[in-house]
Each structure stands twice: as C-alpha cells, then as structure tokens.
A protein has these predicted regions:
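A short acidic, glycine-rich active-site loop
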Residues: 61-78
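Short, well-ordered secondary-structure micro-motifs
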Residues: 24, 51-54, 107-108, 131-132, ...
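General small-molecule cofactor/ligand-binding pocket signal
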Residues: 42, 94-98, 149
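Structural beta-alpha unit
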Residues: 1-6, 34, 85-118, 155-161
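Short, hinge-like loop/turn segments at secondary-structure boundaries
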Residues: 56-60, 112-113, 136-137
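Short, flexible loop segments at boundaries between secondary-structure elements
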Residues: 146-154
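Small/aliphatic-rich secondary-structure junction motif
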Residues: 2-61, 156
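Glycine-rich, Arg-bearing micro-motifs that act as flexible, cationic patches
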Residues: 117-139, 153, 157-160
C-alpha cells in the first residue's frame, strides 16, 4: 500500500470573536505552522439580525443596513488585528468577511477559497447552546467539502503561555 499524503496548506478558521474563537484561532495557527500553510480567518455577520435593522430603518430611525454592516466589519477587523493577528507566530493570515446565514457562508467560503481544512468551535456567542453557532457547526460538518476540525471551549484546551 502506498503512502497517502494530504495537503493542508489552506486552513480556514471560523471566528465570531467569542471565547471559543481564541482556541479555534490557536489551533488553526498550530496546524498551519506544522504544515507550512496559511490561515484564512472567516467572520460572518448573521443576516438574521439584519432584519431588525432594516425594520428600524424603514420606520424612520435613520439606520441604514449597509452602513451598519460596514461599521460591524470595521469593528471586527480592528479586534482581529489587535487580539488575534499579533499571536500568529509568523503564519501568514488573511481575514475575510461574509454576510448571510453563517453555515451557508462558511460552506461558500470553503469552496471559493479552496480550503483544505476548516477549524471551528462547537459553540459561539451567547448561551443559546445549539441555537446559533452550535447548529452552524452541525450543518458545516454535514455539508463541508473539506475535513472539519471541531474545537472545544477554552476550558478544554491547553494554550501556550
């Protein structure tokens, strides 16, 4: 039997900036260091929350959905640049943003970026255990064209000091 080699050069990590995102990021960085690859950080603005913004704008509250999305993405970009990228340990990193249903946008990004591996947490923002990110993880596991690594919360991980 011949040895099988798998390329894991493009490692995508879904980050929602929750406590799970830090361990997700560190796992992706460790894998990229070991494989000589890059990390693509993906953040998705959930379109479900945007429906309320549109309603408020339509009622004359002066809130524009596109401006709101732009502001959110700038804030998240700044947080990623401050809290995550300095700890990349020399691993090349890119950040991409999407707007839509998180699981659908993650699958699209995996395909478009030709990711070799997806790293994601099993939970995310909020305490609605499976309602938001948990169900996102389930759908990504079922539909992803590449392998998916599930990262448990920070209480289960040994991070470098």
């Amino acid at each position: 039997m011949e040895a099988c080699t798998v390329s894991l050069k493009r490692i995508m990590a879904a980050v929602d900036l929750s406590s799970y995102s830090e361990t997700t990021f560190m796992h992706a960085i460790s894998l990229a260091q070991a494989m000589g690859g890059e990390v693509i950080l993906l953040n998705v603005v959930n379109s479900r929350g945007l429906e309320q913004i549109e309603r408020l704008g339509a009622q004359g509250f002066g809130i524009d959905k596109d401006s709101y999305i732009e502001t959110i993405q700038k804030e998240r970009q700044a947080e990623i640049e401050k809290e995550y990228l300095p700890r990349a340990g020399g691993v090349p990193c890119r950040v991409i943003f999407r707007v839509g249903l998180p699981w659908e946008q993650i699958i699209k990004a995996i395909k478009e970026e030709k990711a070799d591996l997806m790293v994601m947490g099993t939970k995310g923002r909020g305490n609605l255990a499976g309602a938001l990110f948990g169900s996102t993880a389930d759908k990504v596991f079922r539909h992803s064209p590449c392998p998916v690594i599930s990262v448990r919360g920070p209480e289960h991980c040994r991070l470098p000091e």
